Amino acid sequence: MSSDGQKAEQKVTLSSPVNAMTQDPSGNLWVVCDGNTGMMYELDGKKLSVQSKTKSGATPSDILYSPVSKSLWVTQRFNNELWEIDPATRKVKTKIAIGREPVAMAPFAGDSCLLIANNLPEMPSTAYPIAVQLDIVDIPSKKVTGRIMLPNGATDAKSVAVDKNQTYAYVTHLIARYQLPTNQLDRGWMATNTLSIIDLKARKLLTSVLLDTPQKGAANPWSVIVTPDDKQIIVAAAGSQELVRIDRIALHERLAKAKQGEMVTPSVKSWNNIPNDAGFLYGIRDFIPTQGKGPRSVVATGDKIFTANYYTSELVSMDLNGKNLKKQVLGAPLAFTKVGKGDMYFHDATICFQNWQSCATCHPNDARMDGLNWDLLNDGM
């Protein structure tokens, strides 16, 4: 695409939907494609011509080039593994067992470590606590050196982003309130949409903040990024059809004060209650409708934010303040097909009370389970 997002300059057709891509020092792009027999493509960075094509596990979900190991690292979702691949030979050098369904990763500690987000809890649904865990992999030793559990009920982790100084990581996921009766949705009674903050120096969870307000859900958070100036966190809320824009500087100032016991908003009761407080981001977060359906991916440059509306096949651009929105249709919208329209409705929280959740909130990943032990009302409480 052109730098303003209004013109397609190069195009390539691949075997299946793209899950992720990375760039190596030569400028070539490495792309992993979805499917039980996943594929990894090497593309010319300028012409997008295919340089190589390699089979790559069961649903390769993310890919990164590491300047430390000078190799590619690929999360293999349904192998529950992280693979190291030699870009010259495209052979697998290392396989590392990690958590349940890894879907995203980001480098930190001077690019010597990877923080990996696993999509689902791996413990039995009768356990307590039950939550998604993050893996820390040390690249030089090629070992898992730590695990970080998110709050009880955390599930469907989708994305991880790290600030420029690699001080904090941000992970999108849900917190399901599965221990409560499923008799209402008000104030996130059943599910809340969450951004967890990881202290990368201490290698532990700092806290989790809710993207929602008390009266509105920011359903199905998908991709998260930190803008190049480190001033904003942008989350694509795919279910509520919007971007959530957070003042990152103000967020960390507020967290520091809250940890000292200050009442930083009228709703804050205590530090430990922040993951339950839908008012914590009041005044430092706003919502930007993308005017389409299914914003899943988001990226920022020095002066623009771009997001992709999955179901309406649009690239959306806007200023860093969320203004001057422009859209460019990239192909036949998925929503125009019968299957695509059904999938769109399944993931659409705007047809739910106050946008709190979509069908995919409890049944993520093509209508599968969320790994939690719900007590539904159909057979009594």
Q: Which positions does each model-derived feature cover?
A:
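Residue-level detector of Asp-centered blade-edge/turn motifs that repeat once per structural unit
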Residues: 23-27, 66-69, 109-111, 164-166, ...
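Residue position within the beta-strands of beta-propeller blades
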Residues: 31-32, 74, 116-117, 171, ...
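Residue-level signature of beta-propeller blades and closely related beta-rich strand-turn architectures
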Residues: 35-36, 78, 120, 174-176, ...
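Short, conserved, GDST-rich strand-edge loop motifs in beta-rich repeat architectures
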Residues: 117-131, 171-192, 248-259
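Short loop/turn segments immediately following beta-strands, especially the blade-tip
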Residues: 139, 186, 198-204, 246-262, ...
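Surface-exposed loop and turn segments in beta-propeller and other repeat-based domains
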Residues: 144-153, 201-219, 256-289, 329-344
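The canonical Cys-X-X-Cys-His
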Residues: 354-366
